[in-house]
Amino acid sequence: MNNTQTVQTTPATLLSLYRTMQVIRQCEERLAKSHQRGLVHGACHTYVGEEAIAVGAFAHLRTDDVVFSTHRGHGHALAKGLHPQELIAELYGRETGCSRGRGGSMHLFKP
């Protein structure tokens, strides 16, 4: 059984990967500003400058693969397909967040 997967580097694939990196960067910059304004409580360790790592690695995952992050997990969650609004709502402590506003930056999870 072969569990490896090759990502085709077509122009469309490359553009999709780039767009995901941009989504992560924009989301993280917004969260950093919100944290400075006191809207995000607790620690908020952003993934700025590391976007390509998650996007490149996660491009090789299957949709049913499970991911556990230990540090700066926002980019991982977004690269795996978490909607940015769910991440932002989570860090704002809202019920509409991926962890119903209870996990925050350090304990993201999506059932």
Where are these regions (language model features)?
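Short hydrophobic/aromatic segments of transmembrane alpha-helices and their interfaces
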Residues: 12, 35-36
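Charged, compositionally biased N-terminal leader segments and the immediate start
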Residues: 1-17
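Cofactor-binding active-site loop characterized by glycine-rich and histidine/acidic residues
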Residues: 29-33, 39-111
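N-terminal glycine-rich anion-binding loops that anchor highly charged ligand groups
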Residues: 19-35
